[in-house]
Amino acid sequence: MKKNIWVIFLLLLSNIVFAQDNLTVVAIGQATLEKTEVAIVASKRSFGGSENIKNANEIMAIIKNDLSFYKKKFSVKATEVSQATDASDWKSKGADFLIVLEMTSAQPLSVKATTYSVKENRSLSEKMSSNSNLRRVAHDLADNSFRAITGDPSIFNSKILFVSDRDTRRGDNIKELYLMDFDGGNKTQLTRHRGMVISPDISFDGRKVVYSLIKEGRSSKRNIDLYLMDLDTKESKLISSRPGINSGAIFMPDGVNIALTLSHEGNAEIYLMDMNTQKLKRITNHYSPDVDPSFNKAGDKMAFLSGRSGMPMIYMMDPRSQEKDVRRISYVGEFNATPRFSPDGKEIAFSSWLDNRFDIFRLDSDGNNLVRLTKDFGSNEDPTYSNDNEFIAFSSQRVLSRTKAVHNIYIMDREGEIFGSITDNYGNCITPRWSK
């Protein structure tokens, strides 16, 4: 009975309110670095008319905001609607790179971005983006320019999955699933179950979502069932309703299997399940409950939570065989929650209960080099890495008054510098999952 209590506790961890003081954020260890200077110009000739100029300014503002997430690399010198669209026009102004926007169609909106090296006076890339959604056009163009300048992928086209209780009414406990751009724009409600959605994950190709559902009602026999959603059609289907817990599911890199926690045989254990056939393969087999798996992209390492030491701590194993090479890797706090691999598999971010609150830590996948990322900033949970390894989204609860506290989704860089909330005034927002 005691084991089942803390299993349920872990599964519902992100739904519990922990009141904390409203504290000031201080960036730790921020160094002064030489930054790349970027200018963004919308061609006045192509963006003729007041409405088009309004769109041009909005696109430039989004591109500038996108680049600001990499503020240790970039400084945006200017954004303006201008006829000065030649790279040579900006050399004397100190710009290293110039992004020139030209509108080719208003309906649907089509914009071309040309990225120039000002010093070399040459074009690095051209990108045409067409979409009725202006924000998607802007993010797409920003991503192309970022890649042209750095040679690396960006986060600008990525999405974040999350859960919010904004539909909750008095007496209800409603939590539904939502999807948004990485910066908090284009929020879209995905589910309308009128129940409690928990433990979501998004597939590697960004086309499917898996989540668990506790249906509304007061029955003590309520099951925790597992659903799979197609993001193209927004249709969900039940894929596991075994007795007890069907939760904590994550997509495997092979696109065929998911890993999840099941308790249908009595104890909570981690399994692989084929999404098409629902065939199971058991990975853990221990008298202590094992929950919340996370895999590296190669599929040869699995981090998970286990109470083998008495309280939930992070363990690592080779998931290719049952109970292979199991070893404990975390020793911080009273207990841990939600371990998540970085995309490159080198690090694990997790939350730990320490000093009467949750804070977020990261450590190398071998258990070395522990780094505390949050401190004196509410109660911080559910870390999830960006697709480029550079950022971590997480949920944090702040006290607004004596009677009100709210969870929001925040973004910080991997060193712990926090950028701010991306879900203000959207209910309690928890369990973020960044697209791969």
Describe the residue ranges of each PLM region.
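Hydrophobic beta-strand positions that form the internal "hydrophobic ladder"
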Residues: 160, 209-210, 255-259, 302-303, ...
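Short beta-strand->alpha-helix linker/helix-N-cap micro-motif
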Residues: 21-90
